[in-house]
UniProtKB/Swiss-Prot annotation:
Record's function text: May function as a substrate receptor for CUL4-DDB1 E3 ubiquitin-protein ligase complex.
SMART domains: TPR, WD40
Species: Mus musculus (Mouse)
Residues the record lists as Phosphoserine modifications: S352, S511
GO cellular component, one term: cytosol
Positions of the UniProt region annotated as Disordered: 489-509, 655-677
Keyword Transmembrane helix part of the UniProt annotation: no
Intervals holding WD repeats: 45-84, 88-129, 132-172, 182-222, 265-305, 535-575, 578-617
Protein name: WD and tetratricopeptide repeats protein 1
Length: 677
């Protein structure tokens, strides 16, 4: 993170009045604050798990909802309970929200009884009760631009909209996910962009996160009602429930291809929380069963794949756009392999460009190389990431980080390695190791045919390596995989089964509409990935931006800790024990370095920077890498093993050693080593 000089900035704030706001934003959350973050207080009052937290706009009130069906409004700065009321729900409360511009008087709750209730806190009464959902209500969302309107997401697959100005006791369906994904889809979370209140993000079953334009949907519905044939349409027209352009999907590029493997191991992917950055340009997703992902909504990118020179001309045309640099903006996320299709540049006769690193970055690179040599893969990745942030045009750093990703083998590491290899080759077409690692990554990501073509291309570009033991070993692996794939397809054909389904969360082909397939194929890839936590046990686990400039990312975890990462480097910087079992909720204060957390324990915990004289060791997880490795193993354990781990049992093979402990990936690489340069 950038160094801070508070004395200098205090003087500037006194001299320049306009600097007051920037001062507040800059010092909202800083690296020294993060290092001193510790437990300030525990708020006691609930008798069950605390499933949701919500700050008011000023930050002087904190609302909580619990399994005990009560909501409590706290004065968090003085650690006082101001109000406690039974909400009228008959099951666990999963979401609580203050209605904007209502003087902190109106509170909305959603619960497992499928109900949404609206409460007047001044008289401690429930003034509206909505029972339109047919399954558990998981999230409520509000928008400052529409102070009388709010939305709910429930496990019946519906996103409903409520208008408190209307006398009706019913809501209207804004989005029906079952129209697109079939009757088994469940909506889990939603949020409204703080800078564009017409933009609604929805997380549901499967790896895809959906963005909708509320205004376009309303205009579409209005035009349908006014059309001469309106009488033959229902509110959600089954032929075209949403207008073209009203939805955009986002997905981590490797997940659609991984779905069959995850499904076979009963590993469920579901977005448990979505939130926008304060400036509305980024979307953060806590993907249940996987990692935390950040999507850039301004500079969108397609998932990365591979194109061979012989299949591409000097100028490619895809989707009407010309591409001459080898990177295309195709529309695919794993179904068709031509998105961000990277065409390897010709390398015959080229001279490898040497980019000198400044001395301090050279030292960081050497430290990373030493960590790699000691098999400290995560430490090496973090050091390379620090260097990459300062020297984003150095091919060697990307190539070295790719090698560390390939060795570590956590979920998503091979795809990040693929991205780094492609970046290294774009910066240095003669990067031999990056070319070879690219073929290995494609193979590990199940792009077997593409891996074979990439390996053949590597042999043509670097003939001196064509008969190395590394090439021979990878070639044998690819050939065996191709034969296995061919046999599997023949058996499926003989049995009347269809081909592999890469973009479906279920095996029922007819449950996915054609419109849904198109949206999935056009989905955008992530910018950053954050690893270390575990999100498999609960489906309400949150991840949030921390800081006015979204400098940090925080997430709860199944191991009872919460994790803090630097946003730009994705490096893990702090792990704190926040619950005896599971941390689900993390809600940062709107203007202070102040964090509220909750989970299975019936308390709300408040965290802020502690005095330097205070001992913080009690809740600090010192071995962050060990905790991260244990969580990766937990995520990959079968459901029975995960249940036993949650009950406190120790399981041989899961309690020690690294995630994916086998390390034969590069054991036979011969002359083409995976060690860093």
């Amino acid at each position: 993170m950038a160094k801070v000089n508070i004395t200098r900035d205090l003087i500037r704030r006194q001299v320049k009045e306009r600097g007051a706001l920037s001062f507040e934003r800059r010092y909202h959350v800083t690296d020294p604050f993060i290092r001193r973050l510790g437990l300030e207080a525990e708020l006691q009052g609930h008798s069950g798990c605390v499933n949701c937290l919500e700050w008011n706009e000023k930050g002087d009130l904190l609302a909580s909802g619990s399994d005990d069906q009560h909501t409590i409004v706290w004065d968090p700065l003085h650690h006082k309970k101001l109000l406690s009321m039974h909400t009228g729900h008959t099951a666990n409360i999963f979401s609580v929200k203050f209605l904007p511009h209502a003087g902190d008087r109106i509170l909305i709750t959603g619960a497992a009884d499928s109900k949404v209730h609206v409460h007047d806190l001044t008289v401690k009464e429930t003034i509206h009760m909505f029972g339109d959902h047919t399954n558990r209500v998981k999230r409520i969302a509000t928008a400052p631009m529409w102070p009388n309107t709010f939305w709910s997401a429930a496990e019946d697959g519906l996103i409903r909209q409520y208008d408190l100005r209307e006398n009706s006791k019913h809501s209207e369906v804004l989005i029906d996910l079952t129209e697109y994904c079939g009757p088994m889809v469940e909506a889990k979370c939603l949020t409204v962009n703080p800078q564009d209140n017409n933009c609604l993000a929805v997380g549901a079953s499967g790896p895809f996160v959906r963005l909708y334009d509320i205004r376009m949907i309303h205009n579409h519905r209005k035009s349908m009602r006014q059309s001469p044939s309106a009488g033959v349409h229902t509110f959600c027209d089954r032929q075209k429930p949403l207008p073209d352009g009203a939805a955009q999907y986002y997905v981590a590029g490797h997940l659609p291809v991984k779905l069959p493997d995850y499904n076979s191991r009963l590993r469920v992917l579901v977005a448990t929380y979505v939130t926008f950055s304060p400036n509305g340009t980024e979307l953060l997703v806590n993907m249940g069963g996987e990692q935390v992902y950040l999507f850039d909504l301004t500079y969108k990118q397609r998932p990365y794949t591979f194109l061979l020179p012989r299949k591409c001309h000097s100028v490619e045309v895809q989707n009407g756009k010309m591409s001459t640099n080898g990177v295309s903006n195709g529309v695919s996320n794993g179904l068709h392999l031509h998105s961000n299709g990277f065409r390897l540049p010709e390398s015959k006769g080229c001279i490898s460009p040497q980019v000198e690193l400044p001395p301090y970055l050279e030292r960081v690179k050497q430290q990373a190389n030493e960590a790699f040599a000691c098999q400290q893969w995560t430490q090496a990745i973090q050091l390379y990431s620090q260097a990459v942030q300062k020297a984003p045009h150095n091919a060697m750093l990307y190539g070295n980080r790719a090698a560390a990703y390939m060795k570590r083998k956590w979920d998503g590491d091979h795809y990040d390695a693929l991205r780094d290899c492609l970046k290294a080759i774009s910066l240095n077409p003669c990067h031999l190791k990056a070319h070879f690692r690219l073929a290995r990554c494609l193979f590990e990501l199940k792009y077997v045919a593409e891996a074979l073509e990439c390996l053949d291309d590597f042999k043509g570009k670097f003939p001196e390596q064509a008969h190395s033991s590394a090439c021979d070993a990878l070639g044998r692996d690819i050939t065996a995989a191709l034969f296995s794939k061919s046999d599997g397809e023949e058996k499926k054909a003989a049995g009347g089964g269809g081909g592999p389904v890469r973009l479906r969360s279920t095996s029922r082909k007819d449950s996915i509409s054609e419109d849904e397939m198109v949206l999935r194929e056009r989905s955008y890839d992530y910018q950053f990935r954050y690893c270390g936590h575990c999100n498999t046990t609960t489906d309400i686990k949150e991840a949030n931006f921390f800081g006015s400039n979204a400098q940090y990312i925080v997430s709860g975890s199944d191991d009872g800790s919460f994790f803090i990462w630097e946003k730009e480097t994705t490096n893990l910087v702090r792990v704190l024990q926040g619950d005896e079992s599971i941390v689900n909720c993390l809600q940062p204060h709107p203007s202070y370095c102040f964090l509220a957390t909750s989970g299975i324990d019936p308390v709300v915990r408040l965290w802020n920077p502690r005095p330097e004289s205070e001992d913080l060791t009690g809740r600090v997880v010192e071995d962050m890498e060990g905790a991260s490795q244990a969580n990766q193993r937990r995520m990959n354990a079968n459901p029975l093993e995960a249940m036993l781990l949650d009950m406190g049992y120790r399981i041989t093979g899961l309690s020690s050693g690294g995630a994916g402990a086998s390390d034969d990936e590069d054991s036979a690489e011969g002359q083409v080593q995976c060690r860093p340069s």
